[in-house]
Amino acid sequence: MRDGGDGSTEGTRRPTARLKAKSTAAAGGGLGALLKDWRALRGMSQLRLALEAEVSPRHLAFIESGRAVPSQDMVLRLADALMLGLRERNVLLVAAGHAPRFGEGAWNSEELKELRRAASMMLAAHEPYPALVLDAASTVLDANTGALTMMGEGRDALGRINLMDLVFSPGRVRSAIGNWSEVAGFLLHRLRENARLRGPRSEAARVLERVLAFPEARHLPPMPGGAGSVLVPLTFTVDGVTTHWFTTVTTFGAPLHALAEEITIEQFHPR
C-alpha cells in the first residue's frame, strides 16, 4: 500500500471515498427523480426551474443526477419555484437526507387542537345552516348538525366519509341535488386542481382516480358557469322541501403544518 500523505494509506481511503460517493448518489437519486417528476407536472424545463430558484443550471443538473446533495435551504428554494405544498416539501427534504420541516399530524392530533377548537367554534356559530371541515382530498373531518343532517350521516362517520363519494355515488346526497351536473362539475374541477397541486402520489389524486371511474364524471363540463354567473348554486331537495344555497370557504392563515395548509371550512348560506 502507498502512503496517502496524511498518515493514512491509499488502500484505506479509497473504500471510504467510494462509500461516500454511493451515499451521495443514493440521497440525491430519489430527490432527482422527484424533481424531474414535478418539473414535468409543472411544464418546467431544467433551465426554467434553475432560473426560478436562482441556482445555476449546472448545480441543478448535478442535484437531479445525484452528483450533488442540496442543503435544506436549496431544497426549499426548489420547492418554492415548483409551487409545492408543505407536505410535498417534506417529501423533497427527506429524499435529500434532511428531516421534515413541517408537521403532518392528523386532524385529531394534539398539535392541531387549537385549529380544531377554532373550526368547532365556526361550525357551531353557523348553525342551523350546514358547515363542514374538508381536507385537500374532500374527506369530511368535522361537520355541524346542519351538515350532518344534509348528508344523512352521524358524527361517527367523520373522518371516514368523503364529499366526492357522497356526491357521485347513488344515494341520499346525489339524489337530493337538483342541479347535480353543475355542482358535481365544480367539485370535480376543484378536486382536479388539488390533485394537480399535490401531485400524483397524493390522496387527492387517489380520490380523483376513484371519482373518474364513475361514467358520469367523463361527461361533466370542465368548469361550470357562464355569463352572469357569480357563484355555483346548490339546489337541495329532501322530503319534498327544496332549499337553495351558496357556499363560502375559509382557510387558516400562514400555516406551518401540512394539514393546516390543506384544510378548508365550507359554510352553506341560504339564497
Predicted features along the sequence, with ranges:
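Short amphipathic recognition helices of helix-turn-helix/homeodomain-type DNA-binding modules
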Residues: 73-76, 80-113
